[in-house]
């Protein structure tokens, strides 16, 4: 068995395709012994690959682009090769129903955004710009965790919060939260992929192919299975969640088409993410798709069927 040290950037329900691949034995079928671990923080997900703590990471292309913005040396590039989360999994949850929500409504609201990682706000501020709104005009809480923001919504301290599942499902079930805007509705936005240093990709192409085959089989299963079956498969990663909340959250993400049906990382989704990071002044360098995505891995795996 070939050992692969795999980092998850953080524990999150929208990573379900990767957890399911681990649980369904797909890696073993490829002769891979995958050891899952986490970096000391999400901001270490990319650098840990060069420091010898992991071989491959799953996480946002944002980290790849951030790394290449800071360290553009060709031999230190990070290469994405198998995407699982093709749309933005974050949701604006308000304290009252607003079925006719428009971004302009946020001018009159107190909005609490995600502080744990930068991508959710970067993508939302790009949405606002495209709607003709200056993100700086929004009354925004920026320094609280999603858990703290959920409590603030319950207590009436904010009007709307930006969160992912299972916060959305929990707030809906409690009757205190209402979906205003699901970011997945904007279309493809590349959110989570396998990536590795270019040196590892060159030396371990067979390993990348094995990881991608396991993911692709899981994606096919994921889109055919019931939400309860998926929940049972990944429950060990979320033992604190009740079955109804977990199943509801998974059903919500399936409805939103957050999870891709195959491992290709679409250029359209990559460009939408990159434009958001540039407009939000998170990165300066306009790294081309071709410099940090190798579509040949996914294409080769898909051609085997």
Question: Over which residues does each language-model region extend?
Answer:
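Secondary-structure end/capping motifs
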Residues: 204-284
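Short, glycine-/small- and polar/acidic-enriched structural segments
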Residues: 2-133, 140-143, 159-165, 176-181, ...
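Short secondary-structure boundary/hinge segments and terminal tails
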Residues: 39, 45, 67, 146, ...
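Predominant activation on well-ordered alpha-helical scaffold segments within soluble catalytic domains
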Residues: 19, 62-65, 125, 169-172, ...
